[in-house]
Amino acid sequence: MTLFEAIILGIVQGLTEFLPISSTAHLRIVPALAGWQDPGAAFSAIVQIGTLAAVLIYFYKDIHSITRGVFDGLRSGRPFETQESRMGWMIAAGTMPIVILGLLFKTEIETSLRSLYWISVALIVLALMLTLAEWLMKRRADKGLKAKTMNDIGWKEALLIGLAQSIALIPGSSRSGVTITGGLFLNLSRETAARFSFLLSLPAVFAAGIYQLYETRDQLMASGSDLLNLAVATLFAGIVGYASIAFLINYLKQHSTALFILYRIALGVGILGLIANGYLQA
């Protein structure tokens, strides 16, 4: 990988990690279209540490209050007394499914499931699921049912959205896409679904990044250029990722996810067309 490729892929990661369009899909598609080598699942996981930093900075106040609530609850012997402490434990519980399934299906995630064919299918299927979630949300609104806010999230919502997050192990599905979709099915407002999605991502993204750093430590230490390129890609991913978070949170206050649904379908169908005509290898 060249430095130029690292910069481009870092920007791609930052742009697509938080939008419900799948960063893994784009990190697979862009190199394929450009004639570059697939950076691999390990690259994706490590560069996500940059976008993790973006979440930490953007949601600093939320994270600080949640962390303080958890420790205060432990010290007082009442770990679930406050909304902040409960949120911390709910995020931890919601993270368990993706951790367990990620370890069980690590080989498939890094090999066969990275096929452009399966990525295209995942892009389209999740778009249809998101369409259904939007339709249900509109029906509830027409009936006068108010959407839930962060204060309304309970154990049921946290665990079900956590289960939905495990679907993101399939490249092309999108971690933010499946968690936002899960949130909409559970009647969270779009903004709330996105906000909880980003907070829920912290433990899983951190764990995946650290694990892949450990797994590839010998390769990285043996090649200074690989280490530099990875650092540059991670930096660009963090900077662009911060802007993507701000954009999506503000966008969903006033708009539906229709734009992302149309994009996912167009991209998925387009890739299948390129594969069918021999322009891309699955």
UniProtKB/Swiss-Prot annotation:
HAMAP family: Undec_diphosphatase. It is an enzyme of class 3 (hydrolase). It comes from Chlorobium phaeobacteroides (strain BS1). It holds the Pfam family BacA. Disulfide bonds: none annotated. This is Undecaprenyl-diphosphatase. Bacitracin is thought to be involved in the inhibition of peptidoglycan synthesis by sequestering undecaprenyl diphosphate, thereby reducing the pool of lipid carrier available. Keywords: Antibiotic resistance, Cell inner membrane, Cell membrane, Cell shape, Cell wall biogenesis/degradation, Hydrolase, Membrane, Peptidoglycan synthesis, Transmembrane, Transmembrane helix. NCBIfam families: undec_PP_bacA (TIGR00753). The gene is uppP. It comes from the Bacteria. Catalyzes the dephosphorylation of undecaprenyl diphosphate (UPP). Confers resistance to bacitracin. It is a multi-pass membrane protein. One of its GO terms (molecular function) is undecaprenyl-diphosphatase activity. The keyword Cell inner membrane applies. It catalyses: di-trans,octa-cis-undecaprenyl diphosphate + H2O = di-trans,octa-cis-undecaprenyl phosphate + phosphate + H(+). The keyword Hydrolase applies. The chain crosses the membrane at residues 40-60, 87-107, 116-136, 153-173, 196-216, 229-249, 256-276. Its main location: membrane.
